[in-house]
Amino acid sequence: MTKAIFPGSFDPITNGHAEVVEAAARMFEKLYVVIMTNTSKKYLFDEKERLDLAKKVFENDKNIEVIARPAELTVEVAHELNAGAIVRGLRNTTDFNYERDIAGINKTLDPKLNTVLLFTRPEDSFISSSMIKETVFFGGNVSTLVPKPVAAALEEKLRNQNNEEK
């Protein structure tokens, strides 16, 4: 069985992420969406919330499993799951340069593990989780940029934060 992992912080999952997951799920018999930690990011959603949201987004996809591995290296997760590939999404050349460097580190740690790069649609190439959070923070509508469960969770999170500030 061909298996791959799609690791990320997914804070929150965007339509670009979902597009890459769906494309990868057509390429591999089993795809693990892995909720991980990026120590350089400030999170809006905690690990459990990110896991629950991802599970909702992909609940109808039979060959996609969502798991959390916040304290492990990507290569270790791939080994644990017997995955032969790491899937990453690309929006632009900046992403390519970053992912090339990460793929180099992963290849050094495990020469047999491949990285598969998938491009998002041009109309989704500007979407980033950081941009989504910034837009929501200032009251913007992002419902066309994220899956429905994510849009609802963002709205609720913002409402709760606004109520706490009052």
From Swiss-Prot:
Listed pathway(s): Cofactor biosynthesis; coenzyme A biosynthesis; CoA from (R)-pantothenate: step 4/5
SUPFAM superfamilies, per the entry: Nucleotidylyl transferase
Transmembrane segments: none
Residues binding substrate, per UniProt: 9, 41, 74, 88
Catalytic activity: (R)-4'-phosphopantetheine + ATP + H(+) = 3'-dephospho-CoA + diphosphate
EC class: transferase
Keywords, comma-separated and alphabetical: ATP-binding, Coenzyme A biosynthesis, Cytoplasm, Magnesium, Nucleotide-binding, Nucleotidyltransferase, Transferase
This protein's GO CC annotations: cytoplasm
CDD domains, A to Z: PPAT
Record-annotated site: Transition state stabilizer: 17
Main function: Reversibly transfers an adenylyl group from ATP to 4'-phosphopantetheine, yielding dephospho-CoA (dPCoA) and pyrophosphate.
Quaternary context: Homohexamer.
Protein name per UniProt: Phosphopantetheine adenylyltransferase
Species of origin: Lactobacillus gasseri (strain ATCC 33323 / DSM 20243 / BCRC 14619 / CIP 102991 / JCM 1131 / KCTC 3163 / NCIMB 11718 / NCTC 13722 / AM63)
